[in-house]
From Swiss-Prot:
Subunit (UniProt): Part of the 50S ribosomal subunit; part of the 5S rRNA/L5/L18/L25 subcomplex. Contacts the 5S rRNA and the P site tRNA. Forms a bridge to the 30S subunit in the 70S ribosome.
Function recorded in the entry: This is one of the proteins that bind and probably mediate the attachment of the 5S RNA into the large ribosomal subunit, where it forms part of the central protuberance. In the 70S ribosome it contacts protein S13 of the 30S subunit (bridge B1b), connecting the 2 subunits; this bridge is implicated in subunit movement. Contacts the P site tRNA; the 5S rRNA and some of its associated proteins might help stabilize positioning of ribosome-bound tRNAs.
Record GO terms (molecular function): rRNA binding; structural constituent of ribosome; tRNA binding
PROSITE patterns tied to this protein: RIBOSOMAL_L5
Taxonomy, superkingdom: Bacteria
Keyword Ribosomal protein carried by entry: yes
Name this polypeptide is given: Large ribosomal subunit protein uL5
Entry keyword annotation includes RNA-binding: yes
Organism: Rhodopseudomonas palustris (strain BisB5)
């Protein structure tokens, strides 16, 4: 008896409807030309980690809960005396999500986390980089339901970059709109 592998909801939606919508809209001749999600990069810069190493470890633990994958702690490359920063001090953490974990994270981001942001009016439609990638910033990482603020005790910002295989911003915007990203009008 063969068991079927788990496929995330957004991946199924992409395969069934989004791919055909984009093919009709942009007139692709080949299925491989249709833009798709490539990866999602989460980054947390922790300024307080310069004075207290435990802050970077706590941020990494919180990011592991959010992403479902262990992040790496990033270290400074150069010394900056005005920030009291020495070389090789922990300054944040990052994680790259691909395949099923990427689709699960985007699903949670769109359906659960972004609606919990105070005074949320939609994502900025101008945050594309010109090559089909989209970046957004979150002021508080506690909007994710996996984080218990009482245990975490701190609230940090987070950068989220959604990398796609789209060649232009218009193609990427159409792809992310099809995934129900709430862009401002």
């Amino acid at each position: 008896m063969a068991e079927t592998a788990y496929v995330p909801r957004l991946r199924t939606e992409y395969d069934k409807s989004i791919r055909t919508q984009l093919t009709e809209k942009f007139g692709y001749g080949n299925v491989m030309q249709v833009p798709r999600l490539d990866k999602v990069v989460l980054n947390m810069g922790i300024g307080e980690a310069v004075n207290d190493r435990k802050k970077a470890e706590q941020a990494a633990a919180d990011m592991a809960l959010i992403a479902g994958q262990k992040p790496i702690i990033t270290y400074s490359r150069v010394a900056i005396s005005t920030f009291k920063l020495r070389e090789n001090q922990p300054i944040g953490c990052k994680v790259t999500l691909r395949k099923a974990k990427m689709y699960e994270f985007i699903d949670r981001l769109i359906t659960v986390a972004l609606p919990r942001v105070r005074d949320f009016r939609g994502l900025n439609p101008k945050s594309f980089d010109g090559r089909g990638n989209y970046s957004l910033g979150i002021k508080e990482h506690i909007i994710f339901p996996e984080i218990d603020f009482d245990k975490s005790g701190e609230s940090w910002g987070m950068d989220i970059t959604v990398c796609t295989t789209a060649r232009s911003d218009d193609e990427a915007r159409a792809l992310l709109t099809a995934f129900n990203f709430p862009f401002r009008q």
